[in-house]
């Protein structure tokens, strides 16, 4: 009951903040001297979204397809790499520094190279998403595996358990919190990463749509897409939270 009350209170606070921002935005564009050309009114953004929804929705499905494919590959690869590095100290010592160093290179800098190597199709976009989503999953899972209480693994080994049983009964369950925390980051990045990749070239997608309306100075449509991307990311993160509650019912506080 207490948890539900806190959740309702948080939702009301978030909704109130959004309403305040929208009101201030409307006042600034209506009475504050801010040019509606550069910063369109909230109602104009809504109208642009509704009027151009068929076009926006077709681009949206392209972006979501790229995002989900890249997310699936990135999460799968991150899980496999984390598992292999946990099983082998040699692999951990050899590849973990490389894994960390690889994240010091901005994805925006890598994207043009991927386009040059792979063209303007779907592959460079999926590859960029994989690069962005792979790291948080791999590192979070690996840290969770390494932080498992060694006494628990020793106890299972004393009872005749092998590596499979140790992962099944100890390491995988105890790594779920880290996994879902990283998964939320990966989910939100997958959509943003797809849009960034589409900015650099492509034929369809929300990023391509944004470039086209930018050239026409249709700022109302640009804002509409920005809010759509934010909404998609929030919905996906809420979906991950829902899956987490179902996968980890013992974490629910009544």
Stretches with model-predicted labels:
Residues 144-182, 210:
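Short cytoplasmic-facing helical segments at TM-TM junctions of multi-pass membrane proteins
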Residues 116, 192-229, 252-254:
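Glycine-rich helix-loop "coupling/hinge" segments at transmembrane-helix boundaries
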Residues 100-136, 143-144:
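Generic hydrophobic transmembrane alpha-helix motif, especially the helices
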Residues 69-99, 116:
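Transmembrane-helix boundary motif in ABC transporter permease subunits
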Residues 89, 146, 177, 181, ...:
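C-terminal transmembrane helix and the adjacent membrane-cytosol boundary/short C-terminal tail
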Residues 1-19, 238-254:
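Transmembrane alpha-helical segments of polytopic membrane transport and secretion proteins
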Residues 31-72:
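Periplasmic/extracellular loop-to-transmembrane helix junction in inner-membrane transport proteins
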Residues 127, 131, 164-196, 236:
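Transmembrane alpha-helices
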């Amino acid at each position: 009951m207490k948890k539900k009350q806190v959740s309702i209170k948080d939702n009301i606070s978030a909704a109130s903040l959004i309403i305040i921002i929208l009101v201030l935005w409307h006042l600034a564009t209506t009475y504050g001297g801010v040019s509606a050309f550069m910063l369109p009114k909230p109602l104009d953004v809504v109208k642009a979204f509704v009027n151009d929804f068929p076009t926006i929705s077709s681009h949206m499905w392209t972006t979501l397809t790229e995002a989900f494919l890249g997310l699936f590959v990135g999460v799968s690869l991150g899980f496999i790499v984390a598992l292999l590095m946990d099983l082998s100290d040699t692999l951990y010592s050899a590849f973990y520094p490389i894994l960390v160093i690889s994240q010091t290179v901005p994805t925006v800098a890598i994207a043009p190279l991927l386009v040059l190597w792979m063209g303007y199709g779907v592959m460079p976009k999926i590859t960029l998403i994989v690069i962005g989503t792979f790291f948080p999953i791999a590192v979070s899972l690996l840290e969770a595996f390494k932080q498992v209480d060694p006494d628990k693994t020793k106890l299972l080994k004393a009872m005749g358990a092998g590596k499979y049983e140790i992962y099944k009964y100890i390491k995988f369950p105890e790594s779920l919190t880290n996994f879902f925390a990283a998964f939320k980051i990966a989910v939100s990045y997958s959509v943003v990463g797809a849009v960034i990749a589409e900015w650099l070239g492509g034929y369809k997608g929300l990023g391509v749509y944004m470039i086209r309306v930018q050239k026409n100075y249709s700022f109302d449509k640009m804002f509409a897409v920005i809010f759509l991307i934010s909404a998609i990311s929030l919905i996906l993160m809420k979906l991950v939270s829902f899956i987490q509650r179902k996968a980890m019912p013992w974490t629910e506080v009544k």
